[in-house]
């Protein structure tokens, strides 16, 4: 559905399109490895993540695994383990709230231990983020509510964080106000 206009535009520009629609909520290591296999087998040059936070996180680590083939997903856990530029990475979020399209972080689930772990590296920030609010209009109300609460948590975290500044606090207050007005809290 939502990706069709983008796919058609790319195909009309003679750009190869391969859709990986196997991302699961709370992306797993095996999901990433499947995406990586497709990326390599199809000789792709760029990643467009079109979806919510799980799609963004999965795409980031597919790119990271591509540029760091000898580093397993588990070995990427923590801070600054990738330190290599990803292939062109364009993020198009279909939810509002996770902020994953512009963060240094990805959260991955180890399906064997059922534990989540963060991967943080500056290379995980998308090269481009395309923010189109119209793609969020068809979301179920529950998804809008949950991602809105996610945005609220991010705003509060930014306000109370250890590296907060006057500008950060101002923006956090503005974000809380906008979220409250638009989610009818």
Regions found by a protein language model. Give the residues of each.
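A general structural-boundary detector
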Residues: 22, 79-82, 139, 166
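ATP/NTP phosphate-donor binding region
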Residues: 1-46
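Short strand->helix junction
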Residues: 24-25, 97, 138
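Glycine/threonine-rich beta-strand-loop-alpha-helix active-site module
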Residues: 30-131
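Short, glycine- and charge-enriched coil/turn segments that flank and shape catalytic ligand pockets
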Residues: 12-16, 70, 185
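Carboxylate- and glycine-rich phosphate/diphosphate-binding segment that chelates Mg2+/Mn2+
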Residues: 105-185
């Amino acid at each position: 559905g939502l990706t069709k206009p983008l796919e058609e535009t790319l195909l009309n520009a003679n750009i190869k399109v391969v859709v990986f629609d196997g991302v699961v909520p709370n992306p797993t290591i095996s999901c990433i490895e499947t995406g990586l296999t497709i990326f390599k087998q199809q000789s792709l040059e760029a990643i467009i993540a079109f979806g919510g936070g799980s799609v963004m996180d999965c795409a980031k680590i597919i790119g990271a695994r591509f540029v760091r083939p000898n580093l397993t997903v588990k070995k990427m856990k923590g801070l600054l383990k990738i330190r290599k530029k990803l292939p062109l990475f364009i993020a198009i979020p279909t939810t509002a709230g996770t902020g994953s399209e512009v963060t240094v972080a990805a959260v991955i689930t180890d399906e064997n231990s059922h534990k989540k772990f963060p991967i943080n590296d500056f290379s995980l920030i998308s090269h481009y983020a395309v923010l189109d609010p119209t793609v969020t209009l068809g979301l179920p109300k529950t998804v809008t509510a949950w991602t809105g609460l996610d945005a609220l948590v991010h705003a509060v975290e930014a306000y109370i964080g250890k590296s907060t500044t006057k500008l950060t606090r101002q923006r956090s207050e503005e974000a809380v106000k906008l979220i409250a007005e638009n989610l009818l809290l």
